[in-house]
Amino acid sequence: MPFEVKQEKQYPKSSNAVYDAALKAVAGLGGKLLRQNPDSGEFEATFDKKILGQVLGDRTQMSAKITASSEESSTIAVEIYPLDAIGRKLMFGARKGVSETVVTWFFAHLEHHLGK
């Protein structure tokens, strides 16, 4: 069973608006940006075991890419997976549902910041 989650969503907003809202969503969840490139619409972030006061059990890392579908529409594709104690991708022994929970919360925060 793969522990990584890949999800893609489309929004009727410009790619810059989605990128800014995504960074706010990461900050709202207590994530740490590892890398960001506004020109290409990409960023990577890590999240601790504890998010919004809830202990999930595993650290996670997310990479996202925002692309413009049209002038007023864009798509965000995210990949999220659990990390071990020293920051490597966890290939086995991860707790079930952690990645799904983080991606669900991320999209909820993203949509809140987009004003959906």
Can you name each region flagged by the protein language model?
Residues 1-116:
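Ser/Thr-rich, low-complexity intrinsically disordered terminal regions
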